[in-house]
From Swiss-Prot:
Pfam families given in the database record: SnoaL_4
Annotated InterPro entries: NTF2-like_dom_sf, SnoaL-like
Family of the protein in this entry: Belongs to the PEP2 family.
Protein name: PEP2-like protein NECHADRAFT_97050
Domain of life (superkingdom): Eukaryota
Signal peptide: none
Organism encoding this protein: Fusarium vanettenii (strain ATCC MYA-4622 / CBS 123669 / FGSC 9596 / NRRL 45880 / 77-13-4)
Function recorded in the entry: May contribute to the ability of the fungus to cause disease on pea plants.
Length: 233
């Protein structure tokens, strides 16, 4: 049986600094927190120029509905989705940054809730997905920027705006979606005209799924990044 209370052996970047440490790295971590929290602050408010400032040229974004795309394409797709009625917002709940001693590479994890409003057959409801963003940051010259942004999708649920009206759900079709973002994937496919990826990183408890494998892989990639290696984007 999988140990549900531990992370994969050897996945912790032991040489990285994540709290305390020298004051110069505290300042760098504050900069990285501001960048990470810029994702929900900027994207949800359509502040696209500010959103672009999070990334380095050539950076990629990897989400359930977009797949792996250059960040500029993600912005274009986000705008198009909004114009078609997609209403996605985020709530942030804290950050933690691992940074190398040189202050040139970092991984910031941002706990958040993705909340998407849907309207189906006259019923308004939100799907809320607990997740963690994973930002792969690099300092080029004097400027920090993300080279890759991914997520762990941990659990989700449906919340009716009006408890008296709730949409019908095809239980058999629902079973075909991953446990960490089952309702999000179901309704994104049903309403957005997209094919949602089913193998996104999940939670440690998603035993026997590709989502657990990708959960562990993302931790290993974070360690590789902090140790100066190149990762497969």
């Amino acid at each position: 049986m999988v140990d549900l209370h531990s992370l994969p052996i050897g996945s912790r970047p032991s040489a990285a600094i994540r709290n305390n440490g020298p004051d110069r790295l505290v300042l760098e971590r504050l900069k990285l927190r501001e960048l990470a929290e810029g994702w929900p602050s900027y994207r949800d408010s359509c502040e696209w120029e500010n959103f672009e400032s999070i990334f380095h040229p050539g950076a990629h974004v990897y989400t359930t509905w977009s797949g792996r795309v250059p960040y500029q394409d993600f912005i274009t797709a986000s705008k198009a989705g909004m114009d078609k009625g997609a209403f996605i917002m985020h709530r942030c709940h804290g950050t933690s940054t691992d940074i190398n001693a040189e202050g040139t590479r970092a991984v910031t994890k941002l706990k958040a809730i993705i909340t998407q409003r849907f309207e189906v057959d006259g019923a308004e409801f939100d799907v809320e997905a607990d997740c963690r963003f994973c930002f792969f940051f690099e300092k080029v010259g004097s400027r920090w920027g993300a080279q890759l942004v991914r997520h762990w999708y941990e659990k989700d649920k449906m919340i009716p705006a009006n408890p008296a009206r709730f949409p019908a759900v095809d239980e058999e079709r629902l079973k075909g979606y991953p446990p960490g973002y089952r309702y999000l994937a179901y309704w994104q496919e049903a309403t957005m005209g997209v094919k949602v990826l089913l193998d996104m990183p999940g939670h440690r408890r998603h035993v026997g799924t590709p989502n657990l494998e990708k959960h562990d892989l993302l931790y290993r990639q974070a360690k590789q990044w902090l140790e100066g290696e190149q990762i497969e984007i």
